[in-house]
């Protein structure tokens, strides 16, 4: 099983590279670049739930079927992972403003990726990792460093979502580039490095 899992990881990495390259040549058909050639329109709120909930559901199923259900370290990782996707799949869509739509094809690709992501993460955490992999995790600094990085990333993500949601005034439909928070850093140092 571990050999198949390694092949799966390699395929996922190659797909990530292929998508990265492809997006330099094709416009992603969502957001202000919305394009019906990627499928019929779905309201953003529904699209987000459909796109993000498979990872939450699949991870829950993998956890429930695992022999490691109540082991402390896998359970801690599950709580962090599910906390992120609870926010992404069910809370974030409720906060989306406006009446934008996304193409069904983009939603379908998101569902596929998120399902594979759950299989990749949950497969390792609950099934593939060696039996002694989690021994002493809570007595070693890397667990706490990783958890702190995760929480910092989550805070940045929530703040970035807040900035995006508040770019427009009610009724405004124009497109804006965010320039606050870490968006400011990316605009100044990444998008315009000579500035």
Locate each region found by the language model.
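Membrane-interfacial catalytic/cofactor-binding modules of polytopic membrane enzymes
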Residues: 133-147, 151-187
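Membrane-interface helix-boundary motifs at transmembrane edges
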Residues: 68-71, 96-105, 133-137, 170-171
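N-terminal signal-anchor/initial transmembrane insertion module
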Residues: 1-60
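Residue-level detector of conserved catalytic or cofactor/ligand-binding positions
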Residues: 186-195
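Hydrophobic alpha-helical segments and helix pairs
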Residues: 72-127
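Transmembrane alpha-helical segments that form the membrane-embedded catalytic/substrate-channel core
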Residues: 15-28, 84-94, 116-124, 149-167
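Helix-coil boundary and interhelical linker segments in multi-pass alpha-helical membrane proteins
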Residues: 1-7, 58-79, 118-144
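Juxtamembrane helix-capping/reentrant segments at transmembrane boundaries
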Residues: 32-48, 102-112, 176-183
């Amino acid at each position: 099983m571990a050999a198949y899992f390694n092949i799966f990881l390699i395929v996922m990495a190659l797909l990530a590279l292929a998508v990265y390259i492809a997006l330099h040549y094709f416009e992603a058909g969502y957001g202000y670049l919305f394009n019906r050639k990627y499928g019929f329109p779905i309201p953003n709120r529904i699209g987000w739930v459909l796109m993000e909930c498979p990872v939450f559901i699949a991870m829950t199923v993998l956890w429930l079927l695992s022999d490691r259900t109540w082991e402390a370290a896998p359970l801690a990782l599950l709580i962090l992972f599910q906390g992120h996707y609870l926010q992404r799949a069910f809370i974030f869509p409720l906060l989306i403003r406006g009446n934008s739509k996304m193409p069904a094809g983009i939603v379908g690709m998101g569902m596929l990726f998120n399902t594979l992501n759950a299989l990749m993460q949950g497969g390792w955490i609950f099934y593939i990792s060696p039996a002694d992999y989690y021994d002493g995790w809570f007595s070693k600094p890397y667990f706490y460093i990783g958890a702190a990085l995760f929480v910092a990333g989550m805070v940045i993500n929530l703040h970035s979502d807040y900035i995006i949601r508040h770019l427009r005034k009610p009724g405004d439909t124009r497109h804006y580039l965010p320039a606050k928070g870490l968006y400011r850093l990316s605009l100044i140092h990444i998008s315009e490095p000579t500035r």
